[in-house]
Amino acid sequence: MNQFIKALYYDKKDPYIPEEYNFFGVFVGEWDIEWVDHLEVDEPRRVKGEWIFSWVLEGAAIQDVFIVPSRSERLQNKQPDAEYGTTLRIFNPKTSAWDIFYGCRGEAIRLTAYKVGQDIILTENTTEEMRYVFSEITSTSFKWRKELKNASGKWDVIAKVRAQRAKG
């Protein structure tokens, strides 16, 4: 298994990815997150999690592991819909976009990501009625939200994340 990790992990981006399309490089590292959902109720659910990003495949892609509740939090705060998933983001020079796969237990999603202003928008490929948005991105924090398109064509936020770069 050690050889698998050595073959997968890479410590920098491949130079073929133009710097202006290196949207996800800022996320490489470990993040402490707060997941917030059930936004329609008076007391939304808040759960501590972790999000870990790394260059992989000789720097041609960025992979993450999304864990809510976090590994330590799971011991005390079990959630019936806990998520332990991974995303693989590969830059596509033909489209100047990122081709993305997200998978966790019971779900597999294909998305495409573009930068719009300062935000990174990942749109689900089949119906285009769900998207994820990274915003307010700095080297030490970012926000993320999951949105669904409603009947009138507007986007409703159904979940949010606040992320702080992990210390240590």
Regions from the language model: what does each represent?
Residues 1-168:
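Hydrophobic small-molecule pocket/channel-lining residues, especially in calycin-type beta-barrels
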